[in-house]
Curated annotation (Swiss-Prot):
UniProt-listed InterPro entries: ATP-NAD_kinase_N (IPR017438), ATP-NAD_kinase_PpnK-typ_C (IPR017437), NAD/diacylglycerol_kinase_sf (IPR016064), NADK (IPR002504)
GO annotation terms (biological process): NAD metabolic process; NADP biosynthetic process
The organism's taxonomic lineage, starting at the top: Bacteria, Pseudomonadati, Pseudomonadota, Gammaproteobacteria, Vibrionales
Gene designation: nadK
Primary location: cytoplasm
Record protein name field: NAD kinase
Amino acid sequence: MKKPFNVIAIIGKPRDQQAIQTHRDLYHWLSSLGYQVFIDDRLSAILNDVPEEHFSGLVELGEKADLAIVVGGDGNMLGAARILSRFNTRVIGVNRGNLGFLTDLNPEDFQHSLEAVLDGAYIEEERFLLEAEIHRHGQVKSHNAALNEAVLHPGQVAHMIEFEVYIDESFAFSLRADGLIVSTPTGSTAYSLSGGGPILSPSLNAISLVPMFPHTLSSRPLVVDGNRRIKLLVSPDNRGTQEVSCDGQVSLPVSPGDEIHIYQSPNRLRLIHPKDYSYYHVLRNKLGWSSKLF
């Protein structure tokens, strides 16, 4: 029987010795099973027992690998997703972080779960990303992608900004607020949730717009069709600097009068899970929801 995966990438920037050991254990275990294994080159100075030719950058890993195993928390997954979504690479996560909504394998027992996945017993789902573009004087000045959210916010803490929101070129509303969170369903359990946004099922083709501390009593989160194009027109009277933050990891500078275009990316993250994965079990477990009554 043909194996579903032949080349496997191990990705992640570890913060502690336990995570480093997980990378090392994964590499030697997968190699012993006959897989061709490559590791994120950010670990080349740490994993000195791995041959130098087995390290590659994220883009090269996306080009080579059938499967990428991301070790760490959701931050590592977000950073990898923006690159790996460009390629036909399936992705699974081993949780070495905190909540771990995206990295769901237990690091103490990853071999048992991964054995079944490597044999083809897994659930696959596609998660869409957002593209964020900063337009100035009719030109795109900068752009990036986000798996969770793109956030317009001031460069200063506790500093309001003014902007208008358009959906498919149709004016929707204006805001005087600390900013706006534009979230995917994947990101609805992240920063958007902290801001009072709704939890969206990950398979839903929708985008949520969540105002951050709006200076009005009537402002509420808004969910729109995922194929809509969001345009934020930043007031030319705003003072100071503003930014668009993609997944809290990449910042795009924004000037007064700029336009911000946010829309669904054509790229998809091919996220896989063990067969017993349940999104609602994850929500219940991570968010501390009540158990069954009977």
